[in-house]
């Protein structure tokens, strides 16, 4: 059985004036989040702003979290990305989903009411347990890090 997450609608325009978040295709991982604004917001180059989504969430299950990610078209075409690059929503958070938007482009960008501004993906969570050790069991890779396997 598929797990369902309770997402509360805080703004009555969501589902009326602004469409409910949906998965675009059966293979979509992310839900589009929309700007729940009264009026358009002009974002100057280099500026950031917090934009409400009109949605609140309480995941409640500590084995799950959600991440907010930029929409690829906004970033590539207009330089519009998330101000914090990725937004993490912990399972015990209960507030409205706000999106930090950063205009890293060269031109002003206008965020229109109801515009799709980010996407949200639910992900499993594994918490680390720390154990003090003196050494690891050796592997073929060892301490090989950045670029250790070459480019081809």
Curated annotation (Swiss-Prot):
Name the reaction it catalyses: dUTP + H2O = dUMP + diphosphate + H(+)
Pathway the protein acts in: Pyrimidine metabolism; dUMP biosynthesis; dUMP from dCTP (dUTP route): step 2/2
- Residues the entry annotates as binding substrate: 71-73, 84, 88-90, 98
GO annotation, biological process = dUMP biosynthetic process; dUTP catabolic process
Q: According to its UniProt record, which cofactors does this protein need?
A: Mg(2+)
Q: Which InterPro entries match?
A: dUTPase, dUTPase-like, dUTPase-like_sf, dUTPase_trimeric
Q: Which GO terms describe its molecular function?
A: dUTP diphosphatase activity; magnesium ion binding
**Which superkingdom is the protein from?**
Bacteria
The EC number(s) attached to this protein equal: 3.6.1.23
Q: Which UniProt keywords apply?
A: Hydrolase, Magnesium, Metal-binding, Nucleotide metabolism
Q: Where is the secretion signal located? A: none
Q: Which Pfam families match?
A: dUTPase
**Of which family is this protein a member?**
Belongs to the dUTPase family.
**Task of the protein:** This enzyme is involved in nucleotide metabolism: it produces dUMP, the immediate precursor of thymidine nucleotides and it decreases the intracellular concentration of dUTP so that uracil cannot be incorporated into DNA.
For this protein, the record's PANTHER family field holds:
DEOXYURIDINE 5'-TRIPHOSPHATE NUCLEOTIDOHYDROLASE
This chain belongs to which protein, by name?
Deoxyuridine 5'-triphosphate nucleotidohydrolase
Q: Which organism is this protein's natural source? A: Citrobacter koseri (strain ATCC BAA-895 / CDC 4225-83 / SGSC4696)
Gene designation: dut
